[in-house]
Regions:
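N-terminal beta-propeller domains
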Residues: 1-84, 135-196, 200-202, 206-207
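Intrinsically disordered, low-complexity coil segments
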Residues: 32-34, 53, 89-92, 120-122
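Surface loop/turn motifs at the tips and blade-to-blade linkers of beta-strand repeat domains
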Residues: 49-53, 87-92, 127-131, 172-176, ...
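A broadly used, surface-exposed interaction patch
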Residues: 80-108
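Hydrophobic or amphipathic alpha-helical targeting/insertion segments
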Residues: 98-130, 138, 146-147
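Blade-edge beta-strand/turn elements of extracellular beta-propeller
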Residues: 126-127, 202-221
Length: 222
């Protein structure tokens, strides 16, 4: 007797025909002439490569030939032999971190504090500039590290290729809606600013006073 293995997966209280739950399966088409048009292939299993810190894993980023991992209250580097190296301590909370890089500097925004690891000099440091207001998320665009200030509408940029230096006037406000910013990303050369009720899209205008500017009409209500 043939049992159809393709189609919808469901679980019901009362089932007349079948009751199935498909886990870790994906469809694969059978070449023309096969007995069935397709079948469900099992997904490859996972293999433990290494253990990084004590957890939880709060962020991962690949830079060059290394994997940089924030686990618990520390930053680690993992090489291609899965050897784990401790690089420095960050604030020990469980919230996810935001990570960005410019090829040589890895920047980690840790729900307020921000840290920088220089891959060329192997120096790890916290941003202590007196004008630094704290950072929720961080991204990289055209030489600037772009970050949003906690509990505010403000988006900031660091000095050019220097995430340890912050000018007190290098910020602007996402004011199309009076909501605070909660996240941000850089995608296709644009800065997406996510508020609790709205999304704004900015770009690098090259202006001397502040490089970022909102794209006209690029505003969405959530």
């Amino acid at each position: 007797m043939k049992s159809p293995i393709l189609g919808s997966s469901y679980v019901a209280r009362s089932v007349n025909a079948a009751d199935n739950r498909m886990v870790n399966l994906f469809p694969e088409i059978v070449p023309e002439g096969g007995k069935e048009p397709a079948f469900l292939q099992r997904a490859p299993g996972l293999r433990l490569l290494t253990t990084v810190g004590t957890g939880p894993i709060r962020g991962i980023r690949t830079v060059g030939d290394y994997l940089y991992v924030v686990s618990g209250g520390a930053l680690y580097r993992v090489d291609d032999a899965y050897t784990v190296t401790f690089l420095g301590a960050v604030n020990d909370v469980t919230t996810p971190v935001s990570m960005a890089d410019n090829g040589t500097q890895v920047v980690i925004a840790c729900d307020g504090p921000m840290y920088v690891y220089n891959t060329l000099t192997s120096v790890f440091a916290q941003v202590t500039d007196p004008d630094f207001p704290g950072a929720l998320t961080v991204s990289f665009l055209d030489g600037y590290f772009v970050f949003i200030e906690p509990n505010s509408q403000r988006v900031w940029v660091t000095a050019l290729n220097d995430p340890l230096s912050v000018d007190p006037l290098e910020f602007a406000s996402a004011e199309a809606d009076p909501d605070n910013l909660v996240s941000s990303i850089v995608d296709h050369g644009q800065v997406w600013l996510f508020g609790t009720n709205s999304v704004e899209v900015w770009y690098d205008s090259g202006a001397a006073d502040f490089p970022l500017q909102r794209i006209d009409g690029a505003f969405n209500e959530i």
